Structure formats: structure tokens, C-alpha cells
Amino acid sequence: MAKEILFNIEARDQLKKGVDALANAVKVTLGPKGRNVIIEKKFGAPHITKDGVTVAKEIELTDAYQNTGAQLVKEVASKTGDDAGDGTTTATVLAQAIIAEGLKNVTAGASPMDIKRGIDKAVAKVVDSIKHQAEKVGDNYDKIEQVATVSANNDPVIGKLIADAMRKVSKDGVITIEEAKGTDTTIGVVEGMQFDRGYLSAYFVTNTEKMECEMEKPYILIYDKKISNLKDFLPILEPAVQSGRPLLVIAEDVDSEALTTLVVNRLRSQLKICAVKAPGFGDRRKEMLEDIAVLTGGVAVLYVGAASEVEMKEKKDRVDDALRATRAAIEEGIVAGGGVAYIRAIESLDGLKGENDDETTGIAIIKRAIEEPLRQIVANAGKEGAVVVQKVSEGKGDFGYNARTDVYENMHAAGVVDPAKVTRVALENAASIAGMFLTTECVIVEKKEDKPEMPMGAPGMGGMGGMM
């Protein structure tokens, strides 16, 4: 396939058009007064969402160069969603801001590599500041409720549901999301756990009438790799045999030799054992094995109800965002929300200098870029960003602007908090992709081939009758 190549300013300009197209569509969703985006679907009703990564994933541009730029920022949103569960829109806004500021300086003749080094130094300082600002959540379910509420687009009902679910199965418990039959959103707690896998051999069956393997108070061995040699497992198998308790083995797979050995032991020594293949695939499998490992008080199921299918999808997106953000908050703590944590981190950059002028420029780019989430939240609320940023910058600690109520107040006290992990990961991913963008000198894309139109048939060639 033939390729097209663009270099230097021309290449970066085309990439930036793609970045802006995607980022402008995503950033309208940021903050409590962020707007919805309607996505056309080829089949079924349109999808209405306020989830940044959902919007990003739907965007494909016709121009190959611009589409390459859009895909770079899409990667920022996706990776942030995967790593932290939320903050996809914030990461997109930050990436766009760093790219825009950086591109001005690179075009003016600054060294892209030195600017990238300055950006990396500044990001490391901001991350340290976020870690120092973070406040641990612990078992404080009120704080958990605050995080869930903010992440669910300031829906207190969803926030309370997630906090209640965590109270019932502990903050490390398993919580799943399903569609309700009616319009109400409720919580159900299922004792134990269910996954879609069965025994690997019929010889493990204990109830031949029902063809089921039933065990009481078994030891459970969870292994995230393939079992191919049972010698390594003998130290685990022997205590199980001596205790007389059954043993359930959940592994990625068990090869035929190891499975035969288990079956022979089951038949000869009456060892109560059963081997099961782990549920899920790839990263999802690892998550599910972790869920099984921490299973304590059963599984909480959030049944999401809505009046229509369109509303159901949108609400389910928000519940999923809120749940994942809550997990992130439990992991690394919470910071003041509404972009305030970034504003407070600017102070940590005041004394930071680069090894040369271009590195110092890179530090200044981050100083300016981390104001952008607050500016965008304010813009989406219909106010003037520069004025609010100035006033919040003059404040101390958790003082910030609550866009939902249009009031300047203590963000922690008002319940406007973000998970520290989300705040950190959003900046790290945005800076990583922006740095790659600024140091790009050449873009190669596939050349579109003009497909010739089908030739028209000559007169008199409509059928076979004219043939001799």
C-alpha cells in the first residue's frame, strides 16, 4: 500500500487539528454543568452520554493525518480510564492544553526535546504535590459517598447507592452493575459468588444424579497461570489431604498431564478435589481472580433502572464511572475537586528551574496547562474562566469554586472531591502523549486510492441474445 508523508510544522499542524476536533467534543462534558453528547448509532436509539472516554472512542476523522492526531488523544482518555477508572475528560483537556502551549514554542524555534524534559520535571513535581495533598478515605463511607456523587455527575442518589453497597460488602467487596427490570435503581446482595465456568473433568462430580460437584468449607487455591507440573503444588496439596477438607483449584488452565494426576488422586485416595478454569480473559481474568480472592460478604449487585433504553445506557455509564472512581479514592485517597488540586500544585513549580531556557519553558507550559481543567469547568458553567482561576489562585488550601452552586467555598466541606489517583494519572498520561506529539517530526499515513467507477455496459450487451 502506498504511503503519504508529511514533515515538520505541516505535520504537527494537521495532527493538532485532529487533537482539537476530538478534545473539543470531549471537554463539553467536564464538570457539574457539563453538557451531554449525542452519538448516532447505526442500529437502535442514539447513545446520550457525559462520559469523556465514550465520546472519544466514537470519533474517527476522514482526513488520515488529522485522524492520527485524534487517535493520540483517544489513547490518553482510554489509558486514563483503564488505569484510574475516571478522569478521562480531564486528561483530554490537559493533553490539548500542553500540546497547544508546547506547539507555539516549538514553532517559534524552541528545542522539542528540551521542552519535553522540562514538562517531565514539572509533572514529577505536581505529582508529588498531589500525593501530599491527598487525604486517606479509610472506612469513612461519607467520603466514599462524596467521591461517587461527584463522579456520577453530581447525582446524590447514585453516590448514596454506591456507599450503601460498600457498607454491605465492605469497601474491598465485589460490586457488579446490571440492568433492572423496572425504573427504580436498587441494591441486591447475593451471598457467595457465581461465574460461568464448570469442572474440567466429570470425575470430579460428587452428586452423580445432578452431575454436580458439591463441597463444604473447601480450601480454595487461586492461580493466575497454567498448571502443567503438579510437583510444585505438592506442598499445597498435602496439607489439604491431611486436614480432610476439600480443595477447589481455580487456575488459568490445567494441562492434560496435571489433570490426569488430579483425577487419579481423586479416584484412588478419595481426595476431595475439583479443578475449574478461571473465568474471563486477559486483564479481565486477573480482575475476576482478585474479586474471588477478596470475596468476603458476598456480592453487591447495583440494579440500574430507567424509563428508556437511552436513559439506561447513560445512567449505567455514570454508575460505572462512580464505582471505579470510588475504588481509586480508596487506593490513594482524595484531594479537593473542581481543578483546585492542580491550582495548589502550581506553588510547587515556583522554585523549579530547567538546565536551559527551553526546559524552563517546558515547566511554564505545565504551569499554564494545569489551570485548564478549572477554566473548562467554569466555561461549561457559563462563567469567565480567567476571573475564577485568579480568585482561586489567591486562596489557600481547599478554597475553590463550586460550579454547581456558583459559590466560592471549602471544597472538602462542600463534598467536591476527586480521587488523588485520578488527578495524578490524568496528568501523567496527558503529559506523556503531549511530549510524544511535540517531539514528532514526521507523520506517515496510508494513501487513499481513488477507486475507479464501474464501467457502463455497452448498448446491446444486456443479455445473451446477441451472441452468435
What feature does the model see in each segment?
Residues 8, 12, 16-23, 66, ...:
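Amphipathic alpha-helical transducer elements in NTP-driven molecular machines
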Residues 45-81, 200-211, 218, 222-235:
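Glycine-rich oxoanion-binding loops at beta->alpha junctions
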Residues 41-44, 53, 60, 95-99, ...:
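Short, ordered loop/turn segments at secondary-structure junctions
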